[in-house]
Amino acid sequence: MAETKKDWDTLTVDLSGVKTVEELHAALKEAFAFPEYYSGNLDALHDCLTDIAVKATEAAPLTVTFAGYKKAKRALGSDFHNFRNVLNDVSEEYPDFVVEWRR
């Protein structure tokens, strides 16, 4: 029996207005519909994104596009680098969780 290709889900997260780490985590919490107990730090982000990535592996793969990231990168500096590392870690471990960057 031939394997059928799963449809892809997509999500776009606009980071163009993000100027602080707190605003970044608030934007992520809203975009991904994280639970109320999301504590707005990198460990919590990794845990919540891993949960989403596992679901993407079991159901439809997910492509997340971060729009306006250049402004957030300038505003957040090394905090943005740490945020991006978390995303890279999750997407490397779960190939059905794809991250794209759009200026």
What are these regions (language model features)?
Residues 2-103:
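Positively charged, polar, low-complexity stretches
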